[in-house]
């Protein structure tokens, strides 16, 4: 009998405290980019019972009503009742945003490659906003080329939110978490779901029996394909027995604390940098999107079944200091050839990434819950597979 291989990933709903913070930060970023596409933004948010603090650094010509953006975001998530302990109408909003450090701006606005040079490539003008390493990943486990555990975990909490907002399950409240354990065979292919954990905030008047029944019938059975479920699959639904107090009333939330939820559920490595509240000159965000774009196109081109791409940058320098492609033995060509193709086809300078993926637009609030990668419900440029032919042509020419 072969040994079981299990892998687990989690997700959280848009009403989770950390995700409220992420969405507020990205809503502020979008509001600024609507007026000033060249703005530099690093907006952080902290939420807790009755209060929201927004702080960070920005350089922009835009005027944004932070108070209005915060309250609208909270209302759209669903915190619209005083009994939740955190509501759009009554929450205190405390903004504290200052101008970006001129020392940092110097390197971002004029990259090392062009300082003192008379001949300048416009795409060399923007240096990386910080040093760092970023990873992108793709695998052929799902149609969107994502690991199955995180894909299912996102879908479960998204389904809970849809049922709440549509009014089908009126007792649901905004905060929720999911966790999915998938069993893999000896060839690392997913064969079944071993366990599902769902914790969802609810009104005090619903019974546990009703909640369990609804979550299994309307969420789990609707989201997880039946061939992954069997009589050995374990369901843990609100295992504490009660989840009435939630959101910022139950736990404080902070921007950037769900970086594994935002990416690949732990299935791939992570460079450590968060995304939300940051404009695209911050390579923590833009280069992570570029790395996903590269990895997804490589798998879509049938050049590998599983790919991890690492990029790394120095602050104030446009060109990446390293590019690495790892196919985990699934590639049909040498990794050195893939790396050469990546360098030829994808412009990985910050300005090149911004142009390639059109990242000066206000598209970020929609990414701040249910994952930045593998989304099928919204059109994100780094999820497109429009470089497949270019990759195939490059490899054929070798």
Swiss-Prot record:
Database matches in Pfam families: S-AdoMet_synt_C (PF02773), S-AdoMet_synt_M (PF02772), S-AdoMet_synt_N (PF00438)
Taxonomically, the superkingdom here is Bacteria
Query: What is the UniProt remark on how the cofactor binds and its stoichiometry?
Result: Binds 2 divalent ions per subunit. Binds 1 potassium ion per subunit.
Which cofactors, if any, are listed as required? Mg(2+); K(+)
The Enzyme Commission number assigned here is: 2.5.1.6
Q: A Gene Ontology CC term for this entry?
A: cytoplasm
Name the chemical reaction catalysed here: L-methionine + ATP + H2O = S-adenosyl-L-methionine + phosphate + diphosphate
Keywords (alphabetical) are:
ATP-binding, Cytoplasm, Magnesium, Metal-binding, Nucleotide-binding, One-carbon metabolism, Potassium, Transferase
The pathway where this protein functions is:
Amino-acid biosynthesis; S-adenosyl-L-methionine biosynthesis; S-adenosyl-L-methionine from L-methionine: step 1/1
Kindly report the protein's main subcellular placement as a broad class.
cytoplasm
CDD domains in the record: S-AdoMet_synt
Query: Which residues are noted in the entry as K(+)-binding?
Result: 44
Q: Name one GO molecular function term.
A: magnesium ion binding
Instruction: Describe the task this protein carries out.
Output: Catalyzes the formation of S-adenosylmethionine (AdoMet) from methionine and ATP. The overall synthetic reaction is composed of two sequential steps, AdoMet formation and the subsequent tripolyphosphate hydrolysis which occurs prior to release of AdoMet from the enzyme.
The name this protein goes by in its record: S-adenosylmethionine synthase
> What organism, scientifically named, is this protein from?
Streptococcus agalactiae serotype III (strain NEM316)
Q: Which gene encodes it?
A: metK
